[in-house]
Amino acid sequence: MFEQHKLSLQNLSCQRGERVLFRALTCDFNSGDFVQIEGHNGIGKTSLLRILAGLAQPLEGEVRWDAEAISKQREQYHQNLLYLGHLLGVKPELTAWENLQFYQRISQAEQNTDMLWDLLEKVGLLGREDLPAAQLSAGQQKRIALGRLWLSQAPLWILDEPFTAIDKKGVEILTALFDEHAQRGGIVLLTSHQEVPSSHLQKLNLAAYKAE
């Protein structure tokens, strides 16, 4: 189980170019929350996730982790965060096995070969573990990146379209993992154009905060 945490959004507004996407977004995400950020294309879902991950600045307002602004505790905050965006962070010259082994080394104190074999099976890459990532399809590269989720010890997961290029079975496996992470006291925030098959899922629609 994770310690209790809270991610607070305080009066957030977001601007892209000359256009304000949303205004006055205030809410809390607490340990155990599994939340889908909804809204039409262009409303600012990815922009919001980047703000929450500390990769972009809001027009107004601030993001707080356990009551302190993330801008004042960047290193500690990022130790508690796993962010997966559209850039996968997969090293193309490394094999699927080597990429997962690299993720394990940076996220876990102990190296466990059996865990990596089990993980290759979970992400559907058994038999392709020795191929360089550059030779794999976009969907297979996405699976390598998603392997980080099973290795992560961070309580806060921020995931931008994690189901893209993933088949129905893969979506079910990932959703079960997200449910489990939340039940252990983690926080999962994601965007998705697909239905998320979870009875624990909460939703936040940015349309309610759309700028006039």
From Swiss-Prot:
Per UniProt, what is the membrane topology? Peripheral membrane protein
Name the positions where ATP binds: G39, H40, N41, G42, I43, G44, K45, T46
Which catalytic reaction applies to this protein? heme b(in) + ATP + H2O = heme b(out) + ADP + phosphate + H(+)
- PROSITE patterns reported for this sequence: ABC_TRANSPORTER_1, ABC_TRANSPORTER_2, CCMA
* Major enzyme class: translocase
Supply the alphabetized keyword list: ATP-binding, Cell inner membrane, Cell membrane, Cytochrome c-type biogenesis, Membrane, Nucleotide-binding, Translocase, Transport
Coarse class of the primary localization is: membrane
Could you tell me which Pfam families the record lists for this protein?
Answer: ABC_tran
Q: Does the keyword Protein biosynthesis apply?
A: no
This enzyme's EC code(s): 7.6.2.5
Q: Which Gene Ontology BP annotations are present? A: cytochrome complex assembly
One Gene Ontology cellular component term attached to this UniProt record is: plasma membrane
Q: Please provide, alphabetically and separated by semicolons, the GO molecular function terms listed in this UniProt record.
A: ABC-type heme transporter activity; ATP binding; ATP hydrolysis activity
Location in the cell: Cell inner membrane
Membership in a protein family: Belongs to the ABC transporter superfamily. CcmA exporter (TC 3.A.1.107) family.
Its biological purpose:
Part of the ABC transporter complex CcmAB involved in the biogenesis of c-type cytochromes; once thought to export heme, this seems not to be the case, but its exact role is uncertain. Responsible for energy coupling to the transport system.
Q: Which PANTHER family match?
A: ABC TRANSPORTER I FAMILY MEMBER 1
Q: What is the protein name given in its UniProt record?
A: Cytochrome c biogenesis ATP-binding export protein CcmA
**What organism is this sequence from?**
Haemophilus influenzae (strain 86-028NP)
